[in-house]
C-alpha cells in the first residue's frame, strides 16, 4: 500500500511545487504582485496600499474604475501592504519548510533518527498515509502563511497625504465617502493654490 502511494505522492508534490513557483513568479519573494495598477496621466496621485491576501484587490479595482471615470486626471497606484518583516520571514520559512517536510514524507526518511530521537506516532502515521500527510502539511502551512501575510490594510493617500486608513477606522470607505474625501481634498488644494504668496524683497 505504501509503495503504491509513492507515484501519487510524487505527482502531488510536482503539482504543489508548480503552484508555488507560479505564485512566486508574480513577485520575487513569493508574494502577490506588489504593483497592481498605475495610470500614467498628469495630475494628483491617489495611492492605495491594500491587503491583497484579504481579497481587497477586487474592491480596489472597483474603486479605481469609479474614480477614473469621475477624475480622469488623477493618477492611481495600488500596491500590496506588506506585513511586519517578522511575519514575512515566518511565511517565507514555512513556504520552504513545507516542501522539505513533504519531500521527507515521500522519501520515507526519518529526520528524528538523525538527532538520535524516536519518531513520534504522528510521523509514523504520516509514513503510512503519505498522500493525506502531504496534503495536511501543505494546507496547514498555507493557512499559517496566509495568516502571517494578512494585514487587513486598505490605506489611501492623495499626494502622499493620508485620507483613509482601515487599520485606524476598522472598515472600508464607501464609494460615496471616498468621492467626497477626494472632492474636499481637491477643493482644498485649489484654494491653497489660489492664495497669493508674498515674497520678501
Swiss-Prot record:
It is a single-pass membrane protein. Residues 1-26 form the signal peptide. It comes from the Eukaryota. Keywords: Endoplasmic reticulum, Membrane, NADP, Oxidoreductase, Redox-active center, Selenocysteine, Signal, Transmembrane, Transmembrane helix. It holds the Pfam family Rdx. There is a cross-link at residues 51-54 (Cysteinyl-selenocysteine (Cys-Sec)). GO terms for molecular function: thioredoxin-disulfide reductase (NADPH) activity. The chain crosses the membrane at residues 96-116. Its EC number is 1.8.1.9. One of its GO terms (cellular component) is endoplasmic reticulum membrane. Its main location: endoplasmic reticulum. It is found in: Endoplasmic reticulum membrane. It catalyses: [thioredoxin]-dithiol + NADP(+) = [thioredoxin]-disulfide + NADPH + H(+). GO terms for biological process: cell redox homeostasis; cellular oxidant detoxification; glucose homeostasis; insulin secretion involved in cellular response to glucose stimulus; pancreas development; positive regulation of cytosolic calcium ion concentration; positive regulation of growth hormone secretion; response to glucose. The keyword Membrane applies. May contain a selenide-sulfide bond between Cys-51 and Sec-54. This bond is speculated to serve as redox-active pair. Belongs to the SelWTH family. Selenoprotein T subfamily. Selenoprotein with thioredoxin reductase-like oxidoreductase activity. This is Thioredoxin reductase-like selenoprotein T. It comes from Xenopus tropicalis. The lineage of its organism: Eukaryota, Metazoa, Chordata, Craniata, Vertebrata.
